[in-house]
Amino acid sequence: MMTTLTARPEAITFDPQQTALIVVDMQNAYATPGGYLDLAGFDVSTTRPVIANIQTAVTAARTAGMLIIWFQNGWDEQYVEAGGPGSPNYHKSNALKTMRNQPLLQGKLLAKGSWDYQLVDELVPQPGDIVLPKPRYSGFFNTPLDSILRSRGIRHLVFTGIATNVCVESTLRDGFFLEYFGVVLEDATHQAGPEFAQKAALFNIETFFGWVSDVETFCDALSSTSFARIA
């Protein structure tokens, strides 16, 4: 059953059962004091409402029959997946730079199996959800995301998570180039950096690459669909 979501710059219509809700990198690294972003000097003090809004969006999406995909950004314990000096990631990843500048943190940031890598306690994947590791900002790079989506006939992606201006925007942009329709729920995302980074990312998305809505509007759009499915 199709539903129409009020969004910027215009409404978008989609079938929830052919749509995925993507939760980007809601790990301690990005959303919890003492995690990577916090240790690297980024403000994570306002992430709690984002976590609550993601919980709300996930519940509504699951009720409507949407696929839920959780991303976790990071690398193996030896950081082979992060790339060496021949990779731009080695030079631009703030996690890698922070560990080089603070040797006591070596091996603690974004390493698989670490507290930093884990999803925040409030967000727990359920049976039927898909959890994907990713080694770079985009969720399409070196992951099976495209295959997973195409095999299920999914063409619409609803994005939540951190950071709006880095991994969320990178994944949505790559999806745009692969012919996916991307929507960001702005109050279920958070930027890395000053507030203007959030505004700039949302401007780019709604102007060039996708659509922007919010959690309440998303839930309202799905509610009639869910009732119709139950009936």
Curated annotation (Swiss-Prot):
InterPro entries: Isochorismatase-like_dom, Isochorismatase-like_hydrls, Isochorismatase-like_sf, RutB. It holds the Pfam family Isochorismatase. It catalyses: (Z)-3-ureidoacrylate + H2O + H(+) = (Z)-3-aminoacrylate + NH4(+) + CO2; (Z)-3-ureidoacrylate + H2O = (Z)-3-aminoacrylate + carbamate + H(+); (Z)-2-methylureidoacrylate + H2O + H(+) = (Z)-2-methylaminoacrylate + NH4(+) + CO2. Keywords: Hydrolase. It is an enzyme of class 3 (hydrolase). GO terms for biological process: nitrogen utilization; uracil catabolic process. The active site is at D25, K134, C167. It comes from the Bacteria. GO terms for molecular function: hydrolase activity, acting on carbon-nitrogen (but not peptide) bonds, in linear amides. Induction: Up-regulated by the nitrogen regulatory protein C (NtrC also called GlnG) and repressed by RutR. Its EC number is 3.5.1.110. Belongs to the isochorismatase family. RutB subfamily. Hydrolyzes ureidoacrylate to form aminoacrylate and carbamate. The carbamate hydrolyzes spontaneously, thereby releasing one of the nitrogen atoms of the pyrimidine ring as ammonia and one of its carbon atoms as CO2. NCBIfam families: RutB. This is Ureidoacrylate amidohydrolase RutB.
